[in-house]
């Protein structure tokens, strides 16, 4: 999972980029919030002006207030809806989670990798500039933390699903998980299940208790 912070802008040109992708049929607007006065038949210029009006209403001292981010995964590993959940967590942790914060989130279909583009303002609804110190470092830390939590949950779900299958040996159980992309290895009385650098452990006695004897 990669979160890429894209260039800032005075004029919110990221709106033009994403709306052009929509008009080309390779993107769609997944979420719009904080734009209560915008008619659904908006134009890109109206969206850009709404961002500019919002920003300079609360803080006119920031030269490049656009925050533009892309979140992408490998292939179809995550659906756009799952990426949207990750985006919400990311925005919260990076300081953009206020319910009145204007945000546009687009799903893109123009590459082999599912990805989202997020456009918002660096100005919070109370007028302060959202912290950008060590922004790229914090961004990577946040996405790693979110993905660590998510990978643990996915691995746990994969284990539960694998336990629903019929198997007669621990090796057969390992094969079920390996077919889903997990690396499995035994260590003492545990089975270690690894993917994308994240490892969960399960006691082998729990697996053995589910073994089906023919």
Task: Go through each PLM region and give its residues.
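N-terminal nicking endonuclease/strand-transfer module with a His-rich metal-binding environment
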Residues: 1-214
């Amino acid at each position: 999972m990669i979160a890429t912070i894209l260039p800032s802008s005075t004029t919110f040109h990221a709106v033009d980029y994403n709306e052009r992708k929509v008009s080309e049929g390779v993107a769609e607007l997944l979420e719009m919030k904080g734009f209560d006065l915008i008619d659904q038949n908006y134009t890109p210029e109206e969206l850009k002006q709404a961002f500019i009006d919002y920003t300079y209403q609360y803080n006119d001292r920031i030269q490049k207030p656009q925050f533009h981010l892309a979140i992408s995964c490998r292939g179809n590993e995550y659906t756009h809806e799952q990426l949207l959940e990750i985006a919400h967590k990311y925005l919260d942790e990076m300081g953009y989670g206020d319910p009145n914060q204007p945000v546009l989130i687009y799903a893109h279909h123009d590459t082999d990798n599912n990805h989202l583009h997020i456009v918002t303002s660096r100005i919070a609804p109370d007028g302060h500039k959202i912290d950008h110190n060590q922004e790229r470092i914090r961004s990577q830390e946040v996405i790693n933390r979110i993905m660590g939590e998510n990978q643990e949950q996915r691995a746990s779900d994969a284990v539960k699903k694998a336990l629903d299958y019929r198997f007669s040996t621990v090796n057969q159980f390992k094969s079920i998980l390996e077919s889903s992309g997990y690396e499995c290895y035994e260590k003492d009385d545990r089975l270690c299940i690894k993917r994308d650098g994240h490892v969960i452990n399960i006691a082998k006695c729990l697996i053995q208790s589910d073994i089906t004897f023919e």
